[in-house]
Swiss-Prot record:
Pfam families: TBP. Residues 38-50 have a biased composition (Polar residues). DNA binds at residues 167, 203, 218, 257, 294. One of its GO terms (cellular component) is protein-containing complex. Residues 1-21, 36-71, 127-159 are annotated as: Disordered. This is TATA-box-binding protein. The TFIID basal transcription factor complex plays a major role in the initiation of RNA polymerase II (Pol II)-dependent transcription. TFIID recognizes and binds promoters with or without a TATA box via its subunit TBP, a TATA-box-binding protein, and promotes assembly of the pre-initiation complex (PIC). The TFIID complex consists of TBP and TBP-associated factors (TAFs), including TAF1, TAF2, TAF3, TAF4, TAF5, TAF6, TAF7, TAF8, TAF9, TAF10, TAF11, TAF12 and TAF13. The TFIID complex structure can be divided into 3 modules TFIID-A, TFIID-B, and TFIID-C. The lineage of its organism: Eukaryota, Metazoa, Chordata, Craniata, Vertebrata. It is found in: Nucleus. The gene is TBP. One of its GO terms (biological process) is DNA-templated transcription initiation. The keyword Transcription regulation applies. Belongs to the TBP family.
Amino acid sequence: MDQNNSLPPYAQGLASPQGAMTPGIPIFSPMMPYGTGLTPQPIQNTNSLSILEEQQRQQQQQQQQQQQQQQQQQQQQQQQQQQQQQQQQQQQQQQAVAAAAVQQSTSQQATQGTSGQAPQLFHSQTLTTAPLPGTTPLYPSPMTPMTPITPATPASESSGIVPQLQNIVSTVNLGCKLDLKTIALRARNAEYNPKRFAAVIMRIREPRTTALIFSSGKMVCTGAKSEEQSRLAARKYARVVQKLGFPAKFLDFKIQNMVGSCDVKFPIRLEGLVLTHQQFSSYEPELFPGLIYRMIKPRIVLLIFVSGKVVLTGAKVRAEIYEAFENIYPILKGFRKTT
């Protein structure tokens, strides 16, 4: 049998010598990859431009979204700031109203005191102005603004306790410039360290007081137990400065602060007191063990401790300390701790 006849018809032409155009290079192979051979194939280009455009569009969309989010956040911040400003304005209005009410109540108490009537105590939460005609009241009935609250002990009842003066601070002007180094070197019981404090610290034993002497001629005297002792001590300090050769005078003597203390002899519920008198008192036991009560009239600051000890400060005259204690004693008795 002929070799060409044994091949299939479609392969007879390829196997014949006439069909072989170039020896050694196959014309067709089923394993040959696409695009190889004699016939050149067109190169297929990918759409790289369209991919870049899509990426740019996505980036633009992301940027727009971020800008929108930032605008929303800015709007929210502006709204919060507006709300805070409104709240601050409301608080200022409330404080102004409360201050006006306090002044009104103090003036009423002063007029009652001059007329011979016992002063009335008011609840701390009722110290507001009365509502104007045509407006709704701030507090529902039966609690109306300026409603007097009767304490557990009448205000007219005397406590029988007299606060004792513990310290008096006074000032005086010596009327001349002073050389503090000379005073510190030549005077007894005097110390001067300008790096720590710009004044000479001088002490005397009778009365046992301490003076702060400044180069401007001003002097502060502390530690006296009475007004007379404070004046006497200030004169002694001025005399010491005179003996050192300075033309010291004794001008404008004035008592700046008086501190008194007493004991009511019973424990006090400070938590209940601060809740009832929130406007006048503050109590932070983690910072300070005493309750700080700021009285309006007289303008005295009281330190009230749970043991019953009371410290009064800020008075200019002795009578203010006595008056402040007589005002606070009925309130303290109303918050007496029962064991």
